[in-house]
Swiss-Prot record:
GO MF terms, alphabetically ordered: ditrans,polycis-polyprenyl diphosphate synthase [(2E,6E)-farnesyl diphosphate specific] activity; magnesium ion binding
Any one Gene Ontology BP term: polyprenol biosynthetic process
Quaternary structure (record): Homodimer.
UniProt protein name: Isoprenyl transferase
Pfam families the record matches: Prenyltransf
Free-text comment on the cofactor: Binds 2 magnesium ions per subunit.
Gene that encodes it: uppS
Length: 249
């Protein structure tokens, strides 16, 4: 039986609240292919993708999921056509400005993770403003990976730790997973329980390489702009049927 979108404002009855993932991460893939299929410019796929993300964020809030992390812009995305990159930077800035008031009212705490210093200054300013305005919110935690690369994240953490050892602030035998995680972009954010990737591609694409050590992965052929609450419901049903062993028998 297919559950309709209109029936999904509250947690579906076939999902057990105690088995929901606390933290969901998404690789939002397929905006360009969606636009091409519709006979539209690629930028229209990105615009439609923003709408899909906004609804997923509200769905997570409505259904009681505590955290959502979205892969918005990777370090490799700078290689895309300049016109597309410039559009994305402008789009991020405009969406932040337009949605901030609503995020505050809906008790969303927003955080950006990645090498933010390389972003346009105007976008950095909007990011800082949104994080400051929502820092005391205690509803859903929404992390946006922007200019993010998993390998780069690990490298910068290693450099930061090595510098502290060199300065005598940290001893080599004090370095453990907890210390390492404090130096990641995602410091203070719990690891994802579930990673969803749209468009059918079966790879991590340099996303949350450390954090996904024991996370469950769900792949759907649905392109990101078409990912809705019905698709999310399918992903959560699949997740709840799995047995998480964390390396144990």
């Amino acid at each position: 039986m297919t559950i309709q979108q209109t029936e999904l404002q509250e947690l579906p009855l076939d999902l057990k609240r105690e088995l929901l993932p606390k933290h969901v991460a998404v690789i939002m893939d397929g905006n360009g292919r969606w636009a091409k299929r519709q006979g539209l410019p690629r930028i229209m796929g990105h615009k439609r993708g923003v709408d899909a993300l906004k609804d997923l964020l509200r769905c997570c809030r409505d259904w009681g999921i505590q955290a959502l992390t979205a892969y918005a812009f990777s370090t490799e995305n700078w290689k895309r056509p300049q016109e597309e990159v410039e559009f994305l930077m402008t789009l991020f800035q405009r969406v932040l400005r337009q949605e901030l008031r609503e995020m505050v009212e809906e008790n969303v705490q927003i955080q950006f993770v990645g090498n933010l210093a390389a972003l346009p200054r105007s976008l950095q300013a909007e990011i800082s403003r949104s994080m400051e305005a929502t820092k005391n919110n205690r509803g859903i935690r929404f992390s946006v990976a922007t200019n993010y690369g998993g390998r780069q994240e690990i490298l910068q953490a290693c450099r930061a730790i090595a510098q502290k050892v060199q300065q005598g602030l940290l001893q080599p035998d004090e370095i453990d997973e907890e210390v390492f995680e404090r130096h990641l972009y995602t410091a203070g954010i719990a690891d994802p329980d579930l990673l969803i990737r749209t468009s059918g591609e079966m790879r991590l694409s340099n996303f949350l390489l450390w954090q996904m050590a024991y996370g469950e992965i769900y792949i759907t052929d649905t392109l990101w702009p078409d990912f809705d609450r019905t698709e999310f419901h399918r992903a959560l049903c699949a997740y709840q049927q799995r047995e998480r062993r964390f390396g144990k028998v």
